[in-house]
Amino acid sequence: MDTTSPTETHDGVADGADALSEILMSDDVSGSLWSAVDSGRIEVLVPELPALRMEQDPIHRHKDVLSHTIAVVAKTPDDMIVRLAALFHDIAKPRTRSFEHGGVTFRHHEVVGSRMTRKRMTELGYDDEIVEEVSELVRLSGRFKGYAEGWSDSAVRRYARDAGPLLGRLNALIRSDCTTRNKQKAADLQASIDDLERRIADLAEEERRAAERPQIDGQAVMTHLGTGGGRHIGDILRMLLEVKRTEGELPDDELYARIDQWWQAHAESYGDV
């Protein structure tokens, strides 16, 4: 029976976090992980992982979930947070497996996996911030499902809002979680993520523009011109906003001069105001 503690490797390395990070950041991460699996080292560091070897993976067509997990880790960018999330993203599948309608399901495995990830990484000695980021990525790792069937703009906004500062890493994890050998399916998935990222950027730009305000408000424009409200005030405010977008913020006296020039050129078209 192996009596080595969870934070101690067979090589005598006392810090489990450093030991696992060394494996994940090696030049050949796939080879390093399989070596750690075969030697029993990974069972000391992350006892939940070997159970994935016995869990069939009907979705990704690997012989088991562990093979899929290591393939995902190998596809990730050189980012410790993303690689840790990839390592743990399916950790709860054995615990959540059920058989329904002749098939296998892993309902809510991301939520359960997030809790398991937090517990294991804390025991390994990772900093709290890293633990929170990785466990949150695991929790969010299934959020992209269903995008190809069509998401509303509100669903896209919710996805981006829930991911927050982890958005880039979440998308990197989702890209890496495609290990199919079907080139068309792989290309379709990458195209879907490209489309999601484009929509997020477009919606963010729309919201930024909607929140923009000219430096001078409508009341100040009316006071300066000595007029009441009307269509001309809205047009002047749009002109001032375009000036702000193209030239940045300008001194107020320069903006009032622009208002005077604009009003001199357009006043007649508004009749009596």
Language-model features and meaning:
Residues 33, 131-139, 233-241:
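Short, well-structured alpha-helical segments
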Residues 1-8, 180-273:
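Charged substrate- and nucleic-acid-binding regions of tRNA-handling and nucleotidyl-transfer enzymes
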Residues 2-107:
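Acidic/His-rich, divalent-metal-binding segments that scaffold phosphate/diphosphate chemistry
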Residues 70-187:
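Divalent metal-dependent catalytic cores for phosphoryl transfer on phosphate-bearing substrates
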Residues 15-19, 31-32, 68-71, 115-120, ...:
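A general alpha-helix detector
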Residues 31-38, 46-52, 85-86, 97, ...:
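Short coil/turn segments at secondary-structure boundaries
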Residues 51-54, 90, 133-141, 154-156, ...:
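A glycine-rich phosphate-binding loop feature that marks nucleotide/adenosyl-phosphate handling sites
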